[in-house]
């Protein structure tokens, strides 16, 4: 699982991919502003190997009174149904905040191919902000 967003200092193919990810990230940021009045403004999307969106999620812990109602979990649930599989080796999740330890563990279990996030979470981040669960990966 890779979780580093490459900057524009790479070859043209990588810059093209980054541009696509930037468009999705901007979409997520717009959506997070809409939900920020009711929930923690975290949104996630999952792209398949062709770059098509197969799952979307927003935080719904307060609305649903659900401790598992994190954006990443919601996106995984939707994508699992659409993909009809629990393995996401070739997929990418994009989220505006580093996934917490629970969500990071779920992404590891789902064998997510790439994780792109907008900011580290120094309090609860599971991919380097607070703790790095990816260091103990067994799924490659």
Where are these regions (language model features)?
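Short, basic/aromatic recognition patches
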Residues: 17-37
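A short, polar/charged loop-to-alpha-helix boundary motif
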Residues: 63-74
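Conserved small/polar residues in nucleotide/adenosyl-binding loops
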Residues: 138-140
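Local cysteine-cluster metal-coordination motifs and their immediate loop/turn environment
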Residues: 96-113
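Short beta-strand scaffold segments in enzyme catalytic cores
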Residues: 42-47
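Short beta->alpha transition motifs characteristic of CBS
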Residues: 54-61
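Short secondary-structure boundary segments
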Residues: 119-120
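Immediate flanking context of iron-sulfur cluster ligation sites
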Residues: 85-97
């Amino acid at each position: 699982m890779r979780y580093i967003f490459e900057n524009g200092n790479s070859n043209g193919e990588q810059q093209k991919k980054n541009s696509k990810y930037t468009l999705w990230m901007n979409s997520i940021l717009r959506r997070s502003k809409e939900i920020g009045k009711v929930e923690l403004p975290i949104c996630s999307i999952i792209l398949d190997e062709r770059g098509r969106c197969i799952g979307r999620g927003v935080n719904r812990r307060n609305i649903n009174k659900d401790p598992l109602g994190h954006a990443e979990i919601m996106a995984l649930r939707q994508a699992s149904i659409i993909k009809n599989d629990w393995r996401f080796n070739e997929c990418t999740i994009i989220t505006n905040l580093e996934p917490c330890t629970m969500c990071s563990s779920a992404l590891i279990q789902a064998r997510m191919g790439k994780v792109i996030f907008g900011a580290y979470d120094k309090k609860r981040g599971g991919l380097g902000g607070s703790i790095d669960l990816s260091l103990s990966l067994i799924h490659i």
